[in-house]
Structure formats: C-alpha cells, structure tokens
Curated annotation (Swiss-Prot):
Name by which UniProt lists this protein: Malate dehydrogenase
Catalysed reactions, semicolon-separated: (S)-malate + NAD(+) = oxaloacetate + NADH + H(+)
UniProt superkingdom: Bacteria
InterPro entries named in the record: L-lactate/malate_DH, Lactate/malate_DH_C, Lactate/malate_DH_N, Lactate_DH/Glyco_Ohase_4_C, Malate_DH_type2, NAD(P)-bd_dom_sf
GO function term, MF aspect, one: L-malate dehydrogenase (NAD+) activity
Function field: Catalyzes the reversible oxidation of malate to oxaloacetate.
PANTHER family, alphabetized: MALATE DEHYDROGENASE
Keywords carried by this UniProt record: NAD, Oxidoreductase, Tricarboxylic acid cycle
Encoding gene per record: mdh
Active site: 190 (proton acceptor)
Family membership noted in the UniProt record: Belongs to the LDH/MDH superfamily. MDH type 2 family.
Disulfide bond entries: none
C-alpha cells in the first residue's frame, strides 16, 4: 500500500536553486523512493516570475515522475503553505548594488515575517522548515519568531552546504574519500564567519587530525577557503552556487526526515544554551537525526581557538538579530 503524499512547499521556486532542487524532490531523492509528494510552489506575484514558474511546472509534468502526485503554483504564502509537511524557504532578496547588509536584513525581515505568519496559520503543526535564502540563520530566526504557535525546533537554517564544502576540502587535503570522513562540525552562521571544525573528525575510523596535523593550514587555508567558497564560485561562474545549494538542502531534509544513521551532520537550529550560545539563536551545531527529530551532540570540548571562532561568528549573529529586533515587534 502506498504512503500518503507529503506536501512540500518551496519558495523562490522559479529561481536557480529552485530549478536545481524541484526535479530531485519529485524523483524521491529527498523523502525516499517510496514517498509520494505534492509540490506547492511559491513565487513573487510578478507576471514574469509567475510565467517562469508555469514553465518549470510544465517541465515537472513532462518528467512524468511516478512519485509526483500534484504540482500547484502560488503567489500567496497562505495558499502555498497550506498543510505543508516540509517548507523549503529558498526565495530571498539578493543584495543589490549599493545595498548595505542592514538594508538586506530589513527587506528580508519583511519577507520572512510574512512567511512565518503564514506557516503559523496554515502549515501542518509538524512542518519541517529549512531556510536556504540568505542571511539564512537570521531569516530562520525571523520566521520562527513570527510563528509562535509552531514549535521553535521546527525551524532550521542551512549549514549543510558549508559542511559539504568542508568535507570536500578535508578529503582533498588528506587524500581520502569524502564518504569515509565523519564527525565534522560547522559552528555558527552561514557566512564567511562560520567555523568548520575537524578536531573530532575521523576518516575510516581513525582521527583525521593525525593525517592533517597542520595548524597553519587549518587557520590560513582551510577555514577561509570554506568561508569564501560561495564568493569564489560567483567569481568563476558569474552566478551563485545553485546546484550545490540545492544538493545541500536535499541532504539536510533527507537526514532530518529519514535519519542520519548515527552520523553527525551540521544544522542551523535554535540554541538551547549549550556551548555558551544564547538560547533561541539559530546557530550551526553538530546533530544526529532519527525518527524525524534532531538531537544536538553535546559536551564536546571547546579549546581556546575554537572558543574564539565560535564567539566571532556568534557576534555577527547577535548583530544581525539586533538589526531586525524592532521589525519583530
């Protein structure tokens, strides 16, 4: 007997990341090869965007995916999020010429306040929300604060792209296969201030730090390379990283829904006060996932260098939060 379909809402659905994401969701890569899906796709109420969305839907139809039960187009979050089991908030206002970061925060605060309120009103009470649109941690915080009737733990931000980028760099440096590396962490904000931390990482069960015993490489090459990878891709491609971002979103939700089989993964989640991170801040932490829930990996040792890096990325998150505080009243 087939499972009941899961409703997946995706915002910014006609954008680059949306285009790289939707076909993989519809093929069963995110929720399982036996899980039917209904896609509820949101775009801005602009004629060009809605027309582009119709084109994407035509292509989805033309794939004849066995798991795709229905696809609908929306311009209003209140219809797009109706009964959603999963919501991928991909659409956000990109930084335009001459825009300061605080201007970007203000514009996105309006978008994510409206979307948080709509989720609060119409989504499933168990909805799993992943914010991909930048600044992802603070946008997730805004949506969470705008949805007081939903559990705070339902709101997450995407650090998985940083996690995957760090995995790839470590595999290259150690000469080992990426699949063998476990227990990597990316702490903090999805921004160049993030702290990728491989102190606990293993490769094929052995400590990775024994293979890469190089503090200068860690500080001067590894951390900046992971932090600035997005900018490097824009420089090379002329466009932002869309396929790798979509891939990370699939990884994040797949592990959240289907479980990580005991492996550590990085998710931006509301802090419970652990590791000196103030409660409620959406911060990248190591988690394991099972039965549709994530559990933070606790009581890891924090050395002086790590404390400094963790506090540095926290400072940025607190500044972002303070920048939008008045907009949440």
């Amino acid at each position: 007997m087939s499972k009941p379909a899961m409703r997946v809402a995706v915002t910014g659905a006609a954008g680059q990341i949306g285009y790289a994401l939707l076909f993989r969701i519809a093929s069963g890569e995110m929720l399982g090869k036996d899980q039917p899906v209904i896609l509820q796709l949101l775009e801005i109420p602009d004629e060009k965007a809605q027309k582009a969305l119709k084109g994407v839907i035509m292509e989805l139809e033309d794939c004849a995916f066995p798991l795709l039960q229905e696809v609908t187009a929306h311009a209003d979050p209140k219809t797009a999020f109706k009964d959603a089991d999963v919501a991928l908030l991909v659409g956000a206002r990109p930084r335009g010429p001459g825009m300061e970061r605080k201007d970007l925060l203000t514009v996105n605060a309006q978008i994510f306040t409206a979307q948080g309120r709509a989720l609060n009103e119409v989504a499933s009470r168990n909805v799993k929300v992943l914010v991909v649109g930048n600044p992802a941690n603070t946008n997730a915080y805004i949506a969470m604060k705008s949805a007081p009737d939903l559990p705070a733990k339902n709101f997450t931000a995407m650090l998985r792209l940083d996690h995957n980028r760090a995995l790839s760099q470590l595999a290259g440096k150690s000469g080992k296969a990426v699949a063998g590396i476990e227990k990597l962490i990316v702490w903090g904000n999805h921004s160049p201030t993030m702290y990728p931390d491989y102190r606990f990482a293993t490769v094929d069960g052995q400590p990775l730090a024994k293979l890469i015993n190089d503090e200068a490489w860690n500080r001067d090459t590894f951390i900046p390379t992971v932090g600035k990878r997005g900018a490097a891709i824009i420089e090379a491609r002329g466009l932002s990283s869309a396929a790798s971002a979509a891939n990370a979103a699939i990884d994040h939700v797949r592990d959240w829904v289907l479980g990580s089989n005991g492996k550590w993964v990085t998710m931006g989640i509301p802090s419970d006060g652990s590791y000196g991170i103030p409660e409620g801040i959406i911060y990248g932490f190591p988690v394991t996932t099972a039965n549709g829930e994530y559990t933070m990996v606790k009581d890891l040792e924090v050395d002086a260098f790590s404390r400094e890096r963790m506090d540095f990325t926290l400072k940025e998150l607190l500044e972002e939060r303070d920048g939008i505080k008045d907009l949440l009243k």
